[in-house]
Amino acid sequence: MHEQYLADPTSVSESWQDFFHDYQRDADPQATPPSPAPVLVEPVTPPVAPASVGEPIRGAAARIVANMEASLGLPTATSFRSVPAKLLEVNRRIINGYLGRTRGGKVSFTHLIGYAVVRAISDTAPAMNASYLQDADGNPRVMRPESVSLGVAVDLQKSDGSRMLLVPVVRHASGLDFRGFWGAYEEMIRKVRANKLSPDDFAGATVTLTNPGTIGTQQSVPRLMPGQGLIVGVGSLDFPPEWKAADPITLAELGISKVITISSTYDHRVIQGAESGLFLKRVEDLLLGVDGFYDEVFRALGVPYEAVQWRRDVNPIDRDRSMLEKQMAVANLIRVHRVRGHLIADLDPLRWKEPAMPAELDPATYGLTIWDLDRQFLTGGLAGGERLALGDILHVLRDAYCRTIGIEYMHIQDPLEQEWIQQQVEGVSPELDLDDQRYILERLNAAEAFEKFLATKYVGQKRFGLEGAESVIPVLDAVLEAAADAGLAGSVVGMPHRGRLNVLTNIVGKSYDQIFKEFEGQVDPDSIQGSGDVKYHLGQSGKFVARSGKDITVELAANPSHLEAVDPVVVGMVRAMQDAINEPEAFSVLPILMHGDAAFAGQGVVAETLNMSDIKGYRVGGTVHVVVNNQIGFTTTPESARSGFYSTDVAKIIQAPIFHVNGDDPEACVRVARLAFAYRQRFRKDVVIDVVCYRRHGHNEGDDPSYTQPLMYAKINERRSVRKLFTEAL
């Protein structure tokens, strides 16, 4: 039509005439140029160098070259996920704090992340354990192993400064609990460092974990090796880059967490992107404590506390009101730990009951979360500081009241006594020096060797041995050493029959010859005659020599098997001695009374003796009570024997402080013994040491306690002696 218009404008209608009047035809389309011929890309062949140029690559380095070249043919894809690391940091700190105070060792971030990777695959994402292979005819196949075997990339620096990458394997990692995984991982690392890896140690990996984050790499896409379907990369644990230079107090106030980036590089032929994404989500969930991940880790390692839980921060715009409420909560938390911190202390060597966190000791009860741990609060002078981060406040309180020592003292009405105890335990380093540790070990050696000799030499004879409570010997030793160094004139000890022979020998100084003669029926004719266990009733006088060279006279009062009958006798003997010395209020003779837990709670003479302890006519300036807490009375469990929570509750009638201590921590036992003596000297009052332990052989050596307490004695039979445990710790 346009051509018709050009030939004769009147041949078209007026409307088309108007349209074509200023119409311009588009430029003629140009022909599409022919596509260039494809360029054939020849594979790049490394230049052939003369033999004198460069260095030959041999051994493990040559295998790395071969593996890297083989990895080029794998069609991989990579997913990333950034995970908040706050909870990971907090729970790891608790774990390592406990391990550092007990058997030693350290759990790394890689241990926890590696275990989370294994758990995520085995529980939720088994597809990530698949790998690609071909049959003999070249047909594609997929292999799905039943268990996860984790290869761990280890960067090893050689003596010449060069680095080598080794990937040993934790086999069947999905069948291990965390303790087993941790042990297998550490054994593998020991082999790497000792250069003792065998070819078998490199075989069988189904998944590989690499952690370049240890050298600061934020995230990585590692190479996937043939025969595997997944390699997981772990980036650095740090604040996001935009916050790295921020003030730590500001970071805490804003609730900014460190993050860790985890990558999943997978074989796209057998693993799909959605599966990789779900896998990484499960890893994040586990590292945030979902499904009791950290609780399981704590139980596997024997950590006797509840794991910290993930919670959302509460930090509104109206921060002043919120912080005021939190400040009040922190003050309440400090007081509650002083009153009830002993409830979560690690006191039971057997740990046959699951730990539980009372609501009043849980910061979450007061609206405090992990995000408040780095925020500063007023402390009221706790550990000599006016302002501390909440994490530091909890650290001070739990070190003082919730480790292997638990203290009951807030029932005391005198604020000076309360303040004195706080000054002795809050923010004070619990470590003993090496000489003290060696001396404690010597005392434990003597206690255990004595019992073992009697058990071997006099088979079948009753001796009411101290096995399970050997720490009582270092306790008595520490009290008497402090008394000797303080210049006291003497001490009188009263005790029941359990452990009496050990105390006679290792504390009072009775000779082995005398003890052995009594086992062989050669009883001293001057002693009170009897039959059966008469040797467990006898008293003895001796001299205790402290390491300083100072000495103190010690008398162990005779006592029949009426347990607490000796209590008023000992106190009366001490009062008579003090009156004879004729130094009013000097109280230079120290009474020490040992008790069984059931007898201390169950016999009325205990309460009667306590009740008279501060009456002017009967005062002796304070008795040190040592309760050998077997956690059972003959065959009766605590819940069937008393109404109180502790066997020592009766001592509260005189407002005596009570120090509960784990008998399998002899260092803590000695610290408590010294503290108890110092309290007695300072306030001239009774004080109680509750050594929580167990009886290895029942009421006496002729009993089989597993009939009445099978679960308890299954634990006891698995338990090594306190001497063995302390030797390993040292």
Language model regions located:
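Short acidic, glycine/serine/threonine-rich loops at helix termini
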Residues: T217-S220, W243-A245, D348, L501-V508, ...
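C-terminal catalytic/motor cores of large multi-domain enzyme assemblies
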Residues: D8, S15-D18, R25, P29, ...
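Extended, charge-enriched "interface" segments that sit outside catalytic cores
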Residues: Y23-V44, R311-S471, L488
